[in-house]
Amino acid sequence: MKFKKKFKWGLLIFFISWIIFAQSCMKFRITDGQAKAEFEQRGLHARFLTVKEEGISLHYVKTGSDSLPTLFFVHGSPGSWDAFKGYMMDSALLQHFRIISVDRPGFGYSDFGTAYHLTDQAVLINKVIQKEDNQKPVHLIGHSIGGPVIVQLAQDYPAEFASLTILAGSISPKDEPKEYWRYVFTYSPLKLLMPGAFKPSNDEIVYFKKDLYSLDTGYADLQMPITFIHGDADKFVTVKNVEYGKSKLQHNPHIKVIIIPGASHFIPWQYYSLIRGHLLTLSAMDSERN
């Protein structure tokens, strides 16, 4: 009996300790001070900024000249603005663009821990875009779940954006894996066991599986150039999403598709040169517009 009692207490202490540990780690973010030091080592000045909307703080980082067109990056799940730190330090890109990367709602330093639906994320992120409006073209780039976020932004505010680049984006509701286990960790006390950023990540993925069906009806409004870049060996987001996107955008003559043979889900980092090359072509697009 004593052993059983000690075992139960030990198990309880373990779970309490795990819950405390889980909420304090794996947040997938760095402090502004750490990031500032990294930029300064490269001789770059980064600005760390916050927009407040209805009691929610949205954190984002900006590099480059405010007189230039904007590359606006939206990260996947989990993640934070620094997923695109390398691009924000790139001297070739900075010759042509101001670069902004945002902590999506629920991640980084943007109301960390609370998941938001797709439409709510678009409304909040657009507040950053409005604040940073410099009357120059804005190009949206989204990776993974950042893909449907930028599609939602473009559907809601079609006149605001010059182009979309969808990197391994999960936009097809019919190609989403069922993953019923996620619902257990969203709608039961087991959610307390999810560490750090994995909790809002799991919650928003559950939301997005339904939200994508609403997104499905708004593609007719997208007339701007749209580029899909995807690996055909992506195990997280199937390359079938590209075919879905093409089928929804048959009215748009400005669709470009780059399928990378053998590439996984992590193309922003593993195929940096290819993606940077694509982004540099957007500068030529801006010149033609002027």
Q: Where are the regions that the model predicts?
A:
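Active-site nucleophile elbow and catalytic-triad environment of alpha/beta-hydrolase enzymes
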Residues: N202-G218
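Conserved loop-alpha-helix segment in the C-terminal half of the alpha/beta-hydrolase fold
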Residues: S91, D232-K256
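Active-site loop/oxyanion-hole signature of alpha/beta-hydrolase fold enzymes
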Residues: S101-V138
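Catalytic histidine-centered segment of alpha/beta-hydrolase-like enzymes
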Residues: A263-Y272
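Flexible "cap/lid" loop of the alpha/beta hydrolase fold
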Residues: P148-Q155, L164-K191
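Short beta-strand/loop motif that positions the catalytic acidic residue
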Residues: L222, F228-H230, D234
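An N-terminal hydrophobic leader/cap segment in hydrolases
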Residues: G10-T50
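Conserved HGGG/HGGXW glycine-rich cap/lid loop of the alpha/beta-hydrolase fold
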Residues: T63-G108
